[in-house]
């Protein structure tokens, strides 16, 4: 298995170094659900601003304030503790009376707004996230500037970030031990983290191998292509390659890579053979995913940050703004810009 730090770069390994998250204010995340509260219903959507506390901690505190069980408070995704983050929580509070959430007090957390909603907010039910990052102590401004320009055109690898694999890769190591011993894992959280890490690592490996090709975005026979911004995909045939290539070049279509698991991976012929060869050595992890009935899926190979802009405060400090769809990692963008010191694994997805 390729170590995360050794995954192939799309724009080559950065020439300079820099510091990500010198302080929480250097990493700002604003959640974008893609919809507004209904204004009625048995749930309450609460938009919070937090700094220095994780999402589960705030959700539990909100449940205690509302005098409801912790499981009645949900959220679309975990947000980093060591950052300034804005996100929505959802509390099930039936009845006509609206609680006064302006009285909710928690250090590092502020209620921005709240309203009734008809449906529970479920994990993953968001459109994306807007990021504002500050990179400090940048050693090579010219290199970072050119990389930002190139990313606007060519994007970045859509790798799962190091945080998916746990501190020091602990989640992936857990999956590997599980795959080797076949011992039942009864802890639901461990099962989820380990299976997710296994599948994500295999995806990253397939993408890393594909990026070694001279023309990364070249459509091949049997590729599974995804409509940009959509989850559906279809298989490319030899007769259509020229037209499909044009649409990929225009960013109408995205080449996908496999999230291995049980069932067919989605690619065929040449593309399928390539993906299978890329992870051929990882038989134990593949067998684990099949055994645990984790269904195979597809994910775009490249990621194009939207609304990308940047502003140099001075020669060694740059503020970068962009929007990413749900499931994508800001650290995968930063990885193509600078070599950073420290471990990304503490940054929540």
UniProtKB/Swiss-Prot annotation:
Ranges where the record places region RNA binding: 180-187
Family annotation (SUPFAM superfamilies): Pseudouridine synthase
Signal sequence extent: none
Gene Ontology biological process terms in this record: pseudouridine synthesis; tRNA pseudouridine synthesis
Gene Ontology cellular component annotations, sorted alphabetically: cytosol
Outcome recorded upon mutating residue 87 to E: 3-fold decrease in activity
Keywords from the named record: Isomerase, tRNA processing
Effect ascribed to mutating residue 79 to R: 10-fold decrease in activity
Catalytic machinery residues: 31 (proton acceptor), 80 (nucleophile)
Residue ranges of every copy of the TRUD domain listed in the record: 155-303
CDD domains tied to this protein: PseudoU_synth_EcTruD
Keyword Isomerase: yes
EC number: 5.4.99.27
PROSITE patterns hit by this protein: TRUD, UPF0024
Catalysis performed (reactions): uridine(13) in tRNA = pseudouridine(13) in tRNA
GO function terms (MF aspect): pseudouridine synthase activity; RNA binding; tRNA pseudouridine synthase activity; tRNA pseudouridine(13) synthase activity
Chain sites annotated for binding substrate: 27, 129, 329
Annotated function: Responsible for synthesis of pseudouridine from uracil-13 in transfer RNAs.
Subunit structure: Monomer.
Family note: Belongs to the pseudouridine synthase TruD family.
Protein's name according to its UniProt entry: tRNA pseudouridine synthase D
Taxonomic placement: Bacteria, Pseudomonadati, Pseudomonadota, Gammaproteobacteria, Enterobacterales
């Amino acid at each position: 298995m390729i170590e995360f730090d050794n995954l192939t770069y799309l724009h080559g390994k950065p020439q300079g170094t820099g510091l990500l998250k010198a302080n929480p204010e250097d990493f700002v995340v604003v959640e974008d659900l893609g919809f507004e509260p209904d204004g009625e219903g048995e749930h309450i959507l609460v938009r919070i601003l937090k700094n220095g506390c994780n999402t589960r901690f705030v959700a539990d505190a909100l449940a205690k304030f509302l005098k409801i069980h912790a499981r009645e408070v949900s959220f679309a995704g975990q947000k980093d503790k060591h950052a300034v983050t804005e996100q929505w929580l959802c509390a099930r509070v039936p009845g006509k009376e609206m609680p006064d959430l302006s009285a909710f007090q928690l250090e590092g957390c502020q209620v921005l707004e709240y309203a009734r909603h008809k449906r529970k907010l479920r994990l993953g039910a968001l459109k994306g996230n807007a990021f504002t990052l500050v990179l400090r102590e940048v050693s090579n401004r010219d290199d970072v500037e050119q990389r930002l320009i190139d990313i606007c055109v060519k994007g970045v690898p859509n790798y799962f970030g190091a945080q998916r694999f746990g501190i020091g890769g602990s989640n992936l190591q857990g999956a590997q031990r599980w795959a080797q011993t076949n011992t039942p894992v009864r802890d639901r959280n461990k099962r989820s983290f380990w299976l997710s890490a296994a599948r994500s690592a295999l995806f990253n490996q397939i993408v890393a191998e594909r990026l070694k090709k001279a023309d990364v975005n070249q459509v091949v026979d049997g590729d599974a292509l995804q409509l940009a911004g959509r989850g559906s995909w279809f298989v490319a045939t030899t007769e259509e390659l020229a037209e499909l290539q044009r649409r990929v070049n225009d960013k109408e279509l995205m080449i996908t890579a496999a999230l291995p698991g049980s069932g067919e991976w989605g690619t065929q012929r040449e593309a399928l053979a390539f993906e299978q060869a890329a992870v051929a050595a990882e038989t134990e992890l593949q067998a684990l995913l099949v055994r645990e009935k984790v269904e195979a899926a597809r994910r775009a190979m490249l990621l194009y940050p939207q609304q990308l802009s940047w502003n140099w405060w001075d020669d060694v400090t740059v503020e970068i703004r962009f929007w990413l769809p749900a499931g994508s990692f800001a650290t995968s963008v930063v990885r193509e810009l600078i070599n950073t010191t420290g471990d990304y694994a503490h940054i929540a997805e």
